[in-house]
Amino acid sequence: MTKRIYIYIVILMMLAGCGTKKKVSPIIPQESVPTWHTCLIRNAQATVETEGMKVNANITMQAVRDSLVVISVMPMMGIEMMRIEATPKEVICIDKLHGQYAVATYEVFNQHITPKLTWKILQEICSAELPNGQAKARLQYTFKKQTIEIQIQYPERQLDTPIRIQKQPTHKYTKIDITQWL
């Protein structure tokens, strides 16, 4: 009888040893989890004209109200060549083609261009909430002795979308002074 009990115990231990173990997932700190925002995403076409040169580009504008604006410029085949990230305090311009980026406050940025660019204007451009309410926007900025005219054709209004929007990591780009671009 005791021999049978020992055999049953050994068989149960072998069966229990072959069972799968539950894996406990690691605890992720709250700071490292990106939060969801309601983001207005717009695709548009922009035409940039400078001293006899005309460039057409597709742009994607993402705006999280009163927080972040991201403008991606894709002049050919959907390849992002330039990215502009703006917060209410600063503007980050990333040139992916040359591997460079520059950070500037609106004060520094506006020392080199006219008319002045503000957070409010940038947010209105990206969300197509311009005062005239039209489907086209025409902007003209001058820096150094060069004038850039930008025409934006907005598509039909796109809906707010829940999205995780993150700033582009700049550690893989070389930081330069904004005046080298302006």
Regions found by a protein language model. Give the residues of each.
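Sec-dependent signal peptide recognition
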Residues: K3-I11
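Bacterial Sec signal peptide processing site at the extreme N-terminus
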Residues: L12-P34
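Non-transmembrane domains of secretory- and envelope-associated proteins
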Residues: K21, D95, N132-L182
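Post-signal-peptide N-terminal segment of Sec-exported extracytoplasmic proteins
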Residues: T35-P75
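Short, solvent-exposed coil/turn segments at beta-strand boundaries
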Residues: H37, Q62-L68, A86-E90, N132-Q140, ...
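Short, surface-exposed coil-to-beta transition loops
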Residues: V55-N58, I79-M81, T147-Q151
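An acidic-aromatic
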Residues: V69-K120
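Charged, gly/pro-rich active-site loop segments
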Residues: K116-K136, Q140
